[in-house]
Amino acid sequence: LSGKPAKXHLSVGEQAIAMT
């Protein structure tokens, strides 16, 4: 996920984890 956007290629659950 480093250097990549947290949306679009991730599911809602994955986004929440990445945002935490």
Curated annotation (Swiss-Prot):
It is a single-pass membrane protein. Keywords: Membrane, Mitochondrion, Mitochondrion inner membrane. Residues 1-20 are annotated as: Disordered. GO terms for biological process: oxidative phosphorylation. One of its GO terms (cellular component) is mitochondrial inner membrane. Pathway: Energy metabolism; oxidative phosphorylation. It is found in: Mitochondrion inner membrane. Its main location: mitochondrion. Belongs to the cytochrome c oxidase VIII family. Component of the cytochrome c oxidase (complex IV, CIV), a multisubunit enzyme composed of 14 subunits. The complex is composed of a catalytic core of 3 subunits MT-CO1, MT-CO2 and MT-CO3, encoded in the mitochondrial DNA, and 11 supernumerary subunits COX4I, COX5A, COX5B, COX6A, COX6B, COX6C, COX7A, COX7B, COX7C, COX8 and NDUFA4, which are encoded in the nuclear genome. Component of the cytochrome c oxidase, the last enzyme in the mitochondrial electron transport chain which drives oxidative phosphorylation. The respiratory chain contains 3 multisubunit complexes succinate dehydrogenase (complex II, CII), ubiquinol-cytochrome c oxidoreductase (cytochrome b-c1 complex, complex III, CIII) and cytochrome c oxidase (complex IV, CIV), that cooperate to transfer electrons derived from NADH and succinate to molecular oxygen, creating an electrochemical gradient over the inner membrane that drives transmembrane transport and the ATP synthase. This is Cytochrome c oxidase subunit 8B, mitochondrial. It comes from Oncorhynchus mykiss.
